[in-house]
């Protein structure tokens, strides 16, 4: 007997500016990720229900097509677009459920545009939502629980249109983060517990994705010997992105997963906290496991800012040693920085650019501090009337939405772009990527040229207008 609910849309909204989408959506090995959370929801949906995953960054919402229920999950800067999609689908008779970090922070706002909302994680309540829809008893609010990752199925990769995304694959091995930085909403959404996925499950999924590595053709061996050992892996697309917020939060589990990566013979990159560099045996195992890069949230060069934001693992006077320890093992460093903290002055922009270039970081994102709903910094700034914009489209880390302490909004806007221009200038790329000693230039040079293209949009006054100074 067919399921009474026949067709579902799972929608990942985009920013309502095509140019802003392009700025952060280039199809490169480090960008352009599919909506893995929606692919998990699809895997939890009964097989006799037709599921369509729509990534609005790359395709249009199929308005007018038959659909019973739509789930829309986006970040804060996606919400204006998400609400427009929800409103239109509801006029077509579609029941709409909204979820994600922003909806968790402001569920009543989201209910103005949806029939129901999911607060926190959705996997544990998705079956209830489907049952209630069929019964005609859909609730307004569903409160998600912290699910055990061992109880989850493998995501529906068949729903991804591969031409839209980076050439590798994506996987989740842990969920949550124990640090609780004031600018981050991860703990507000996932809770304070840190959950791990069994290493055996991870091994099986990787083998299902890639299979065992076949014997190498002579031409691949020649490329590996004469150009770079990574090249055959890129040709075979044996590249994995580990999406965890902090891969090493549970060291014993991280070691078990690294042994899996080593056995499966892949190349991979992911996110880790700064204190990774204090564990030399972990660094050695990461190198042996095929790690080509680690994204580290350095955030700031000011220890005062670090302490104020409660990012306690970070010690700014150890940053250079951390980078060198990774570079010595052939692991690239992808740094993330934010500007606009209370200890930042107009000198911070050149300080970050100097640090990135001198320490030869393979990539560096410099973002404007954004008081995202659900974070402690949002609550602090809101209580002190420092937030001057609640136009959610501007909560994209490229727009100033609050009053900085030691500079004007205009100085913050222009300074962030100055940092990008220096880091991704041809001179900056040469010094960081091509000047010896260098790490995996075959991989990072095209990535940097892509970021240079992205920089032109990020620095465009047409795409991100320069704000007026505010009193």
Which ranges hold each PLM region?
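Acidic, low-complexity intrinsically disordered segments
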Residues: 2-236
């Amino acid at each position: 007997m067919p399921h009474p609910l026949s067709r579902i849309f799972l929608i990942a909204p985009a920013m309502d500016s095509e140019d802003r989408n392009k700025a952060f959506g280039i199809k490169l090995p480090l960008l352009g990720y599919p909506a893995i959370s929606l692919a998990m929801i699809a895997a939890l949906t009964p097989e006799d229900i037709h599921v369509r995953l729509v990534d609005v960054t790359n395709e249009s919402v199929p308005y007018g097509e038959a659909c019973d229920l739509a789930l829309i999950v986006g970040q804060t800067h996606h919400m204006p677009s998400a609400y427009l999609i929800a409103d239109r689908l509801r006029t077509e008779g579609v029941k709409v459920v909204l979820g994600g970090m922003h909806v968790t922070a402001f569920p009543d706002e989201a209910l103005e545009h949806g029939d129901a909302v999911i607060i926190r994680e959705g996997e544990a309540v998705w079956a209830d939502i489907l049952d209630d829809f069929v019964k005609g008893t859909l609730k307004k609010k569903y409160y998600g629980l912290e699910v055990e990752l061992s109880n989850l199925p493998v995501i529906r990769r068949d729903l991804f249109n591969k031409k839209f995304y980076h050439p590798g694959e994506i996987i989740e091995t842990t969920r949550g983060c124990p640090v609780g930085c004031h600018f981050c909403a991860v703990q507000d959404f996932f809770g304070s517990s840190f959950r791990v996925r069994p290493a055996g499950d991870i091994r099986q999924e990787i083998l299902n994705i890639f299979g065992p590595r076949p014997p190498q053709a002579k031409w691949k061996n020649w490329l590996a010997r004469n150009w770079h050992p990574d090249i055959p892996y890129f040709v075979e697309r044996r590249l994995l992105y580990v999406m965890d917020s902090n891969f090493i939060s549970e060291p014993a589990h991280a070691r078990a997963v690294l042994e899996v990566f080593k056995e499966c013979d892949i190349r991979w990159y992911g996110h880790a906290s700064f204190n990774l560099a204090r564990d030399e045996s972990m660094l050695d195992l990461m190198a042996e496991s095929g790690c080509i890069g680690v994204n580290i949230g350095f955030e700031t060069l000011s220890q005062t800012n670090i302490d104020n934001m409660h990012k306690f693992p970070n010690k700014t006077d150890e940053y250079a040693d951390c980078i060198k320890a990774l570079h010595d093992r052939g692991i690239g460093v992808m740094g993330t920085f934010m500007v606009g903290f209370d200890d930042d002055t107009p000198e911070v922009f050149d300080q970050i650019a100097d640090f990135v270039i001198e320490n030869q970081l393979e990539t560096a994102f410099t973002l404007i501090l954004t008081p995202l709903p659900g974070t402690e910094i949002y609550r602090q700034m809101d209580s002190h009337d420092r937030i001057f914009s609640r136009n959610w489209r501007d909560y994209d880390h490229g727009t100033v939405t609050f009053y900085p302490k030691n500079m004007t909004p205009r100085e913050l806007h222009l300074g962030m772009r100055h940092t990008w221009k220096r880091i991704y200038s041809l001179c900056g790329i040469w010094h960081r990527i091509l000047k010896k000693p260098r790490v995996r230039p075959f991989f990072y040079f095209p990535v940097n040229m892509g970021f240079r293209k992205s920089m032109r949009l990020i620095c465009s006054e047409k795409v991100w207008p320069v704000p007026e100074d505010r009193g």
